[in-house]
């Protein structure tokens, strides 16, 4: 006698079905059109093949191609079709792995001759053929012995290695599409035809097997896929726009920074770039002062014993740089390390003097330079480096102060992003992971506070911020908020964090004296707004396409003389601009004025003031804005007043205007 399962549908209805009924049969029982459109089903939040039997009760949803969750299936299936196409065209090629990644997928291949960009066109054409065949995806469960034998016969040595690494108690799933098959966890759609034609192979790169430089180098083909052609076109257009805005190219054109092979992941800041960086620090320093933070500075190099106590040496050592004096008889037991994080140093500063509950909250902030090892292949301009500056802060407070501190941090973060022109912000609360420190009651209490804070933020900033909860995504030492902002071309960047920490205060025995004269462990909050300041500056450069707001621009105004007769007048204007705090310089070179304008425009100078004999006689200038061919004639007094106001940062403008 068949057992039945009870299923709850999105509309709230419930119904019993046979235990062995498949997802496809269930969809067909609802409607033939739904079965035709279905690509998978979700049971209790887990996506499954339509061919899978139901097997258990719970919440069920039929996933169609229009469902956002189908996009991962489309890309996953596309990766399989890519592998089949490659082996049809280049039979000697071994396949390895092909996961879905953000905005697409890739597949790594082993062959003597790496693929070229020209090969991608041929492979893409073959993929369209395979999709057109509309072969069904079919799953089989193989024994480990059978899988090893068959993949060994096919000379798929990387697959054999993968099979050997799979735990003995885990099923080996094999997915067929026609005669071609691959080792895969699934799930997949019904057939290759459901992938559609909205895909494109993007680039070829080298990649070490399993990311280990000691292993063979493979060829990685990257691709992207979408549910429809319009989404694909929009994505490709965004990539074109992103290439134009690439901060690495703009950094060269604007003379901001450079990198060298003998300092991989280390930034050589030029004068203009460093000025822009200092503008960020000056802005944040004022904001911190307004919010009663104390700026501190902890050592760059600390003994290994401190990192062992903090736990970093145990779980983060591979990302740290050791610092050992270059002395022949130096004791190897005495090892120092460059700090990868600022938090242990801040705990030491907090502990240095006895604190009463009346002293709390203590808010310690630092523009702390940290060093973290990143593989050379992961380095990317300012976005991914080995040495960077964090606008880090750590708040030590009582349990009763936690909610207010989180709300204060949120106000600071959102107002900061608004000052830089970011209007679309999302906030995610990540809750307890499976592996964690602290009791369940401690987590319950902290999460209840954070959820209450989230609701307050939702109410206060209704329509201004998107919120969500990510179960199980918190750090092992406490729940956290993550702030993500959207830039001018629709890309999302995770920047700010507010992280509750149960771990470090206990490890370092940090305490304060409560009103009953008893020792109490403070609540510790890690807080960052920019995150990596270098990365945030890279985001700003790309967001503004180098057209920085006047208050952020490293070189705000250039006064360009048309002829040598106007040189003295140009110097006079420049001096007056500098006197009111503007960053200005004169261009008195014996060059044509159009050449000067073009050169300074390429360097993204926001304002060019052109002056000649006529301007000198009338005590005026011709103002030209970056990105515009229009020229506006103004008196020097009007010009100075206009630029002085515009060059004022938003926070200073607020303080003046009240």
From Swiss-Prot:
Residues 1-64 form the TGS domain. The keyword Transmembrane helix does not apply. Keywords: Aminoacyl-tRNA synthetase, ATP-binding, Cytoplasm, Ligase, Metal-binding, Nucleotide-binding, Protein biosynthesis, RNA-binding, tRNA-binding, Zinc. GO terms for biological process: threonyl-tRNA aminoacylation. GO terms for molecular function: ATP binding; metal ion binding; threonine-tRNA ligase activity; tRNA binding. Its main location: cytoplasm. This is Threonine--tRNA ligase. It comes from Bartonella quintana (strain Toulouse). The gene is thrS.
